[in-house]
From Swiss-Prot:
Catalyzes the dehydration of methylthioribulose-1-phosphate (MTRu-1-P) into 2,3-diketo-5-methylthiopentyl-1-phosphate (DK-MTP-1-P). Zn(2+) binds at residues 105, 107. Keywords: Amino-acid biosynthesis, Lyase, Metal-binding, Methionine biosynthesis, Zinc. One of its GO terms (biological process) is pentose catabolic process. This is Methylthioribulose-1-phosphate dehydratase. Pathway: Amino-acid biosynthesis; L-methionine biosynthesis via salvage pathway; L-methionine from S-methyl-5-thio-alpha-D-ribose 1-phosphate: step 2/6. Belongs to the aldolase class II family. MtnB subfamily. Its EC number is 4.2.1.109. SMART domains: Aldolase_II. It comes from the Bacteria.
Length: 211
């Protein structure tokens, strides 16, 4: 029989996730992926809850108190806490992908500019050695399409537009003029995949500039 974590244990889990997200926020900031109050970061706490950044905080200067816990419907466990405006998109990933342990979202120059310059519904990534950074890919002779969705301030409508993509889960997706959403089994592996995606989009920007 599996016993539910008691308050002390639950608090320890949130504190651990907060330390991880504070550290990752600083690394993302060092890369220029989370300017001003941009981006949002989360990690799974339990089967039914996640730790996520508060709304409106700079991700490069996070403190433990900036990480709060919410249920998978986005409701904060503690009254008065205000999670990221995009909490619903994080919750969608955890609900659709039970193996996901972390979700990271940034606003890089490459992801923003590339998707505004091209109105296509996806970015083709082919022939890159770094594609092998993603699960199940063993050769550069691979072609994948990174989905791009039009940005929308209505999170319910945006989540509904994204939902069909999880029928065959992509390695991540991009919101047009906004940024990448990436996920992984834990915070470190999620960062690894975000880093690979950011590198690939930077390469695509350079290729198009050189044409």
């Amino acid at each position: 029989m599996t016993l539910a974590a008691g308050p002390a244990e639950a608090g320890d889990v949130l504190a651990s996730r907060a330390r991880e997200l504070v550290a990752i926020g600083a690394r993302m900031d060092a890369r220029g992926w989370v300017p001003a109050s941009a981006g949002n970061l989360s990690a799974r706490c339990t089967a039914d809850s996640i730790a996520i950044t508060r709304s409106g905080v700079h991700k490069g200067r996070l403190e433990a108190a900036d990480i709060i816990e919410v249920w998978l419907d986005g409701t904060p466990l503690r009254a008065g806490d205000r999670p990221s405006a995009e909490t619903q998109l994080h919750c969608q990933v955890y609900e659709r992908l039970p193996a996901a342990g972390a979700v990271l979202h940034g606003h890089s120059v490459a992801a923003t500019a590339l998707t505004l310059a091209d109105n296509s519904p996806g970015i083709v990534l082919e022939g890159y050695e770094i594609l092998k950074a993603f699960p199940g890919i063993a050769t550069h002779e691979t072609r994948i399409v990174l989905p791009v969705f039009d940005n929308d301030q209505d999170m319910r409508r945006l989540a509904a537009a994204i939902a069909p993509a999880f029928a065959a889960p992509p390695i991540g997706y991009v919101l047009r003029g906004h940024g990448i959403y990436a996920w992984g089994e834990d915070v470190e592996r999620c960062f690894w995949r975000l880093e690979a995606l950011e590198f690939l989009l930077s390469c695509e920007c350079e290729r198009r500039r050189m044409r």
